[in-house]
Amino acid sequence: MAGIIVGIDGSDHSRRALEWAVKEAAIRHAPLTVLVVQPAIAGYAGNAVGYPGDASLADQARKTAQEETDQVLAQVGGSSPESVTVQSAIGIPAAVLIAASQDADLVVVGSRGSGGFSQLVLGSVSTQVTHHAHCPVVVIPPRRP
């Protein structure tokens, strides 16, 4: 999966990361992988009547990510990445991105910019990926007023 990987979750900060990654992949003439991770629901087997299992949730997340990616590609216009692939996975977002970084040239993530005590105690996906990725990481900061 050489090229650029961008992790998205449907938030505004991940959309900014996606926009940046699309432009960077186009500049580098590199393939872009858009990765959305659906956290597993602890203690939930799924498949009960009316309730989707983890695989269904991941598939829906991939479809939503594909729509968002298509919108960003149309919005950015101009040159585009060598190729764009949208993938979904089930797991812990930081762990999945770190594992994917083994075969990447660059990982791009957004940051909520929360910082402070909550980040110290809980960590954040961007912090964990920055510290443990196997390739360079770009963290797109939140917009400032």
Where are these regions (language model features)?
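Small/aliphatic-rich secondary-structure junction motif
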Residues: 2-51, 100
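Hydrophobic structural packing positions in well-ordered secondary structure
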Residues: 4, 21, 97, 108, ...
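Short glycine/serine/threonine/alanine-rich loop segments
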Residues: 28-31, 82, 135
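General small-molecule cofactor/ligand-binding pocket signal
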Residues: 35, 85-89, 138
